[in-house]
Regions:
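N-terminal auxiliary segments of SAM/dcSAM-dependent transferases
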Residues: 1-24
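S-adenosylmethionine/decaboxylated-SAM
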Residues: 18, 23, 30-55, 62, ...
Length: 181
């Protein structure tokens, strides 16, 4: 990172570290046990290159998730593609044994149509489409239970399809409309 981005990244990391420490200490599992669980999941990601994730993003997401383990509610991922991030979240939830359920939301039709707010984004409607079967295969291949799968564009999914309490939401929408929905 350079300039203002470097400062912002440093501030975010400091805030995340403080929240993480609080979440680990308050979740009832014990800091040492939680560190072992998290380190085990992160070890599986070490050295792997992910097509849609930059270096360190899985670690960043999982550290943030651990920071809210003491908060009531389930975990949601808005935009799951083939399920790489989802599978790491599910591994952590399963190994931590904290009783939280992962809910994923995706159209499985690729990106929605661009709007004026998206500017010169190079991707068009339908880009990054992955079938629900391909998503499920990611979990099957890893011997992980499937999360609760909700199919549709974000703005079309009924409110009843969301958990009544959410402790962590990972938004992975690519266009303005997706995030605003």
């Amino acid at each position: 990172y350079e300039g203002a981005d470097k400062l912002y990244a440093r501030q975010m990391w400091g805030s995340t570290t403080r929240c993480y420490d609080e979440g680990v200490n308050e979740n009832g599992m014990g800091a040492a046990n939680m560190e072992r669980v998290l380190d085990g999941v992160l070890a599986e990601a070490k050295g792997k290159k992910f097509i849609m994730l930059g270096a360190g993003q899985i670690e960043y997401i999982l550290h943030n998730l651990v920071s809210v383990f003491d908060v009531p509610g389930d975990v949601i991922e808005m935009g799951c593609n083939i399920g790489v991030t989802s599978s790491y979240i599910q591994r952590l939830l399963r190994r931590a044994k904290i009783g939280k359920t992962l809910h994923v939301y995706d159209s499985f039709e690729g990106l929605p149509a661009k709007t004026a707010e998206d500017g010169a984004t190079p991707c068009d409607k339908g880009a990054s489409a992955v079938t629900e079967d391909a998503f499920r295969k990611t979990f099957k291949d890893l011997d992980l239970p499937w999360p609760v799968i909700n199919k549709g564009f974000f703005g079309e999914i009924a409110d009843d399809n969301y958990p009544s309490q959410i402790c962590f939401a990972f938004f992975d929408g690519d266009f303005y409309g997706s995030i605003m929905d």
